[in-house]
UniProtKB/Swiss-Prot annotation:
GO cellular component terms listed in the entry, alphabetical order: BORC complex; lysosomal membrane
Keywords: Lysosome, Membrane
Gene expressing this chain: borcs7
InterPro entries from the UniProt entry: BORCS7
Subcellular localization(s) per the UniProt record: Lysosome membrane
Keyword Zinc: no
Protein name (database record): BLOC-1-related complex subunit 7
Function: As part of a BORC-like complex may play a role in lysosomes movement and localization at the cell periphery. Associated with the cytosolic face of lysosomes, this complex may couple lysosomes to microtubule plus-end-directed kinesin motor.
Keyword match Lyase: no
Amino acid sequence: MTASTEGQARYGQSVKGLLTEKVSTCGADVIALTKQVLKGSHSSELLGQAARNMVMQEDSILHSEDSLRKMAIITTHLQYQQEAIQKNVEQSSNLQDQLKHLLK
């Protein structure tokens, strides 16, 4: 081989080596980019799921608040009924006393 042929061969090998290195680097960059895109996609899926869960929880909270309001109304009505029963028991006791007094 002549010096120029040998120089061209070395230059070709050098260029080939640089190209191989650049292709490897680009391949690694593409893999890293793909992983990042997938991670971002997964993150957006998680955020979407979190948003759906929050909406479901909000509905549950609203339903619970409604149930608590209804229970408060029922409690108030039960208190009125308890007071009425207590008043009737007192009146019944008074009537019994009056009957005993009349029957003596």
